[in-house]
């Protein structure tokens, strides 16, 4: 069987520059999604394009530790560190979900030095929509 010769300039071998452009972003939106199992922090510009994101799982927390307030604080710090370097000074915060990491993530955002124009709770609440699942019996 003949050996396959790797082509120079193929997509897998050559990578031209960094994928993320380092634009100057003065204002952005920080989305915090806090579930009982994990906390995901996404930073976007005002048009909704994702600049940076982090979660408790990507920060190295496994299992039930992902739902802790400390994990949420670490995830928020990681997501915001990159956008502060890109020059973000002001931000709006949208918090979604009932998780333990809500307050801890907000505390980490406040401590980062970004001025918050407002904090909004965007947790979806049904107007008596679908029937909820039956109660757990343990």
Curated annotation (Swiss-Prot):
Domain of life of the organism encoding this protein: Eukaryota
Compartmental location: Plastid, Chloroplast
Alphabetic keyword roster: Chloroplast, Plastid, Ribonucleoprotein, Ribosomal protein, RNA-binding, rRNA-binding
Gene: rps11
Protein name, entry field: Small ribosomal subunit protein uS11c
Single GO term (MF): structural constituent of ribosome
HAMAP family per UniProt: Ribosomal_uS11
Species in which this protein is naturally found: Eucalyptus globulus subsp. globulus (Tasmanian blue gum)
UniProt-listed Pfam families: Ribosomal_S11 (PF00411)
